[in-house]
Amino acid sequence: MGRDTIANIITSIRNADMDKKGTVRIASTNITENIVKILLREGFIENVRKHQENQRFFLVSTLRHRRTSKGVYRTILKRISRPGLRIYSNYQRIPKILGGIGIVILSTSQGIMTDREARLKKIGGEILCYIW
C-alpha cells in the first residue's frame, strides 16, 4: 500500500491549525514543496523554511492564525482526488470554491497550480484539493 503524501500534508496542516500550533513539519518532496509554495503565495501560511535532519529534508511551515470578532478563523483543507478515485477536470469545469474566494489546487501537465492559473493557461488536470 502506497503513501498519500498530499493527504499527509493536508492532515498535518489541519491538525496543527485545530490544535493552534504555530508550526508544522512536513516531509520534503517535489509535490509537497510545490503545494506549500502555493499556500505561501495565497496567504494560507506565513513562511516556510527547509530543514535537514539525519540526511532527510523537511519543510517547516509557520501557520497563519487569523482572528475575527467571533473567534479564530479556521482554514479548511479538503482532499478531493485520492489514489483510489482520481478526479480530473478540463479548464472550463474547474469548480469555483465559495464563488472564487477559496482555491483549488490542480496537478496539470505544466506542474501544480491553482484554479486561476489553470483557467488563464486554459489547461485542466487532476483536482488535488480545495482550500477555503
Curated annotation (Swiss-Prot):
One of its GO terms (cellular component) is chloroplast. One of its GO terms (biological process) is translation. Coiled coil: none annotated. Gene3D superfamilies: 3.30.1370.30, 3.30.1490.10. It comes from the Eukaryota. It is found in: Plastid, Chloroplast. Keywords: Chloroplast, Plastid, Ribonucleoprotein, Ribosomal protein, RNA-binding, rRNA-binding. GO terms for molecular function: rRNA binding; structural constituent of ribosome. Pfam families: Ribosomal_S8. SUPFAM superfamilies: Ribosomal protein S8. NCBIfam families: PRK00136.1 (NF001109). Part of the 30S ribosomal subunit. Belongs to the universal ribosomal protein uS8 family. One of the primary rRNA binding proteins, it binds directly to 16S rRNA central domain where it helps coordinate assembly of the platform of the 30S subunit. This is Small ribosomal subunit protein uS8c. It comes from Dioscorea elephantipes. The gene is rps8.
